[in-house]
Amino acid sequence: MRRTKLYRFIVSDENLFRAIYALESFVFEPKLLSANDLVLFYRLHDKLNHTLVQDVMGQVRARLEDVLVNDELFSLRVYFNPKKLNPDTGEIESRPLHTANLVDQIAMVALLNALLFDVSDNKMILNQLALSLPPNFYGNIPSKEPKHLFVPWKEKYKEYTESVTQSYERYTETKKYSHEVTLDLVQFFPSLNPLLVYDWIIRGC
């Protein structure tokens, strides 16, 4: 594994630094970090602290070796954030929030980068998989900007609302829909077959 181009890309200084550089864009819930990790999170805001960044990169590289070479797993914690009271059952409905320690989160992003960027040319250029998302998708779009893992949601939400407004105006004028879609968001993720997605990625999208 260590000899492969993919592994060398994942543990490269460039890839690990990019993951650290985008840190503020993917740690959505800093309050879920441990006290020590929260201190580290704020210290890593200074990307020019060479000693600290090199130390963290070493820790991340060690964790990646644990996972990729020694077949260890990342440890996750789940917190349940209360959303609302179900009027029918009287039960509190919650949204699960998954988190990990800060070094593991950076390691996960370093792994994700291998799916988003062109490994073969050893350049940080978005690859075919990252670019295959359709233009009318407004979710997590991989960003070309190093400080963002994904395009900022406010920017994508603005595009989404403009598109919805235009569609509504067209309907008002023509009384015709362009599409009719029925969605069951509750069952969306359980209905995904990871093997189909994996095969699609392996075939090169």
Predicted segments with their positions:
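Conserved two-metal-ion catalytic palm core of "right-hand" nucleic acid polymerases
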Residues: 1-205
